[in-house]
Amino acid sequence: LNPNVSVLGVQTRTQMKQLYQNTKFYFQGSRLEGLPNSVCEAMLCGCIPIGSRVFGIPDIIGNTGLLFDTEKDLVQVKDFILSGLGEKESKQARKRIISKFNISKRIEKIKENID
């Protein structure tokens, strides 16, 4: 693996929160994915999201990060990471999760679908 990538294994909730808070970007490169909690958690902690354009990921990220289609787009991902994004984009990602995907709104939507 690249020296900038670490495989950490299982982490506690506290460890995950610390990792998110100390990370500028969160990458979700799934080929199939519903609505990944990990992207929501990372954005809530201020990570700028980068995700594949599949299922629920674009709904979560919106215009607060980068969406890509295939492995061929990884040059675009690299350029995005090196573009100098910072505090403003981090705050936008956090604000989007709080306003659109907070737990109360998610529970209400589930209740609406059940009724």
Model-identified regions with their sequence ranges:
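Nucleotide-activated donor-binding/catalytic signature segment of Leloir-type glycosyltransferases, i.e.
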Residues: 1-10
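Short alpha-helical donor nucleotide-sugar binding micro-motif in glycosyltransferases
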Residues: 18-23, 28
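Structural motif corresponding to alpha-helix initiation and N-cap regions
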Residues: 10-14, 71
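Aromatic "clamp/platform" in nucleotide-sugar-dependent glycosyltransferases that forms part
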Residues: 31
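Short hydrophobic beta-strand element within catalytic cores of glycosyltransferases
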Residues: 48-51
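A charged, aromatic-enriched C-terminal amphipathic alpha-helix characteristic of glycosyltransferases
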Residues: 72, 85-115
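Short alpha-helical segment that forms part of, or immediately flanks, the ligand-binding pocket
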Residues: 17, 36, 40-44, 55-59
